[in-house]
């Protein structure tokens, strides 16, 4: 009997390269909201599909935006 073929999942497309983003800025709230869950948590790398370096920059930008009150610390609430 032949082995069954194992399907490999397609690699995720990098959303930053698709949107042609070269620099991650804490003032770009529309971009940063794509990387935050509805609960206000920063989404994981495996969910968003960005590189390690980009994930660090995104996390730092989100934290800076929260500090200056551009983004909430928590989600929308109840």
UniProtKB/Swiss-Prot annotation:
It holds the Pfam family Ribosomal_S18. GO terms for cellular component: cytosolic small ribosomal subunit. GO terms for biological process: translation. The keyword RNA-binding applies. Keywords: Ribonucleoprotein, Ribosomal protein, RNA-binding, rRNA-binding. InterPro entries: Ribosomal_bS18, Ribosomal_bS18_CS, Ribosomal_bS18_sf. Binds as a heterodimer with protein bS6 to the central domain of the 16S rRNA, where it helps stabilize the platform of the 30S subunit. PANTHER family: 30S RIBOSOMAL PROTEIN S18, SMALL RIBOSOMAL SUBUNIT PROTEIN BS18M. NCBIfam families: S18. Part of the 30S ribosomal subunit. Forms a tight heterodimer with protein bS6. This is Small ribosomal subunit protein bS18. It comes from Kocuria rhizophila (strain ATCC 9341 / DSM 348 / NBRC 103217 / DC2201).
